[in-house]
A protein has these predicted regions:
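Boundary at the C-terminal end of the N-terminal hydrophobic targeting segment
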Residues: 16-18
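Short active-site neighborhood of thiol/selenol oxidoreductases, capturing the structured segment around
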Residues: 33-47
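Thiol-based oxidoreductase modules, predominantly thioredoxin-like and allied folds used
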Residues: 20-21, 65-97
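Typically the conserved alpha-helix immediately C-terminal to a functionally engaged Cys/Sec
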Residues: 51-65
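Sec-dependent N-terminal signal peptides
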Residues: 4-14
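Non-catalytic, surface beta->alpha helical segment in thiol-disulfide oxidoreductase systems
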Residues: 93-147
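Structural recognition of the beta-strand scaffold that forms the well-ordered cores
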Residues: 38-41, 70-73, 116-119
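C-type cytochrome heme c attachment motif
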Residues: 45-52, 116
Length: 147
């Protein structure tokens, strides 16, 4: 875990701040106009760890959200088609529920453990992380280059 976090910190050292967005359409539009790294956080309503993760995110300074695009979605509830770095993803319903293919495919063809993070550089190179990132780990990832 520590090695993976160290690797994420190195790759994401220039991710010091993020701009929070509400849709992938907005992410793609802005990313094409002004390329920046993208951070995606997948959470669900039933995931207790996800609630802790969101609380940890809320503790980060407001300035955290300036130079990286950030979006958080529930892949069980987000039904819109998504285009992300030129690839299209759809929601797959199983009747009463379902899962968005973006989470499934970015997790390597399986249902991810939540919270599920995707870190993408401006060229679409992606790293993923499943599970809670504690406040200290978030600070290490987002602010590593400043310390």
């Amino acid at each position: 875990m520590k090695l993976k976090l160290a690797f994420l910190a190195v790759v994401l050292s220039y991710f010091s701040h993020a701009q929070m967005l509400s849709s992938f359409e907005e992410v793609e539009k802005l990313r094409k106009e002004n390329p920046k790294p993208v951070v995606v956080l997948f959470t669900t309503e039933w995931c207790g760890v996800c609630r802790v993760q969101k609380k940890n995110l809320s503790k980060l300074p407001q300035s955290t959200w300036d130079s990286v695009y950030f979006i958080s979605i529930n892949p069980e509830k987000y039904h819109k088609d998504i285009e992300f770095f030129g690839k299209k993803y759809t929601f797959v319903s199983n009747g009463t529920s379902g899962l968005h293919k973006i989470a499934y495919e970015l997790a390597g063809g399986r249902v991810p453990a939540y919270p599920f993070w995707v870190f993408a550089d401006e060229n679409g190179k992606m790293l993923t992380h499943e599970g809670l990132l504690k406040e200290k780990e978030l600070n290490s990832i987002f602010f590593n280059h400043n310390h």
